[in-house]
Amino acid sequence: MTEVVAREVYYCGVCSFPPEYCEFGVSLKRCKDWLQDNNQELFDKIYSDDALATQTSTLSIERQEKISQELAKKQLKEEAKQERELQKKLASKVLIKRIERNRRKHIISISGLEVFNIDMKKLAKTFASKFATGASVTKTADKKEEILVQGDVSDEAKEYIEKLLEEQGLNGVEVEQVDEKKKKKATAPGATPAA
């Protein structure tokens, strides 16, 4: 009987395809750079001049040019898309509102995190366990999600969110704290306020 040996497959750290298939993705240039830094032997096997010449020898010159133009166009589109997403993330801000419920009780509302691909339910659960309070995810009037946390933990929440965004490489994102107080009931004209 022959012994079955598992084949070890090496995956790209950029697009998560095997390096032989990176050319079908949209970030070939970054994939090549990553492969050259992490596995020079495989890079030489796939992208050396000899390897490229043998792969393209069966294609006509016109077809080769067309393929390279399409690939360059795809790469430019993908780079522009990633740049737009990064600018959108950096331009947005996280808003932490401290809302007064009663005289001494507060709720904080955290909104603006949906842009950063953060799982709101997991974050609410983390806040609930970290701050030992109740936390939930609700929808706002404009159909965006926000996290409501009971208690005045806005400073701690701000620190945690800044650390979370920093881990994602988004240091320039603004995290703003706002105090929102309930409006007091207006007394009728001529009536004296109760003491």
Curated annotation (Swiss-Prot):
Residue ranges occupied by any SUI1 domain in the UniProt entry: 94-165
GO cellular component: cytoplasm; ribonucleoprotein complex; ribosome
Chief localisation class: cytoplasm
InterPro entries for the chain: DENR/SUI1_TIF, DENR_C, DENR_eukaryotes, DENR_N, SUI1, SUI1_dom_sf
GO molecular function: mRNA binding; translation initiation factor activity
UniProt entry tagged with the keyword GTP-binding: no
A GO BP entry: formation of translation preinitiation complex
Residue numbers spanned by region Disordered: 176-195
Presence of the UniProt keyword Ribonucleoprotein in the record: yes
Cellular localization per UniProt: Cytoplasm
SUPFAM superfamilies, A to Z: eIF1-like
Domain notes: The SUI1 domain may be involved in RNA binding.
Family named by the database record: Belongs to the DENR family.
Quaternary structure, from the entry: Interacts with the 40S ribosomal subunit.
Protein name, per record: Translation machinery-associated protein 22
Annotated organism of origin: Scheffersomyces stipitis (strain ATCC 58785 / CBS 6054 / NBRC 10063 / NRRL Y-11545) (Yeast)
Name of the gene encoding the protein in the UniProt record: TMA22
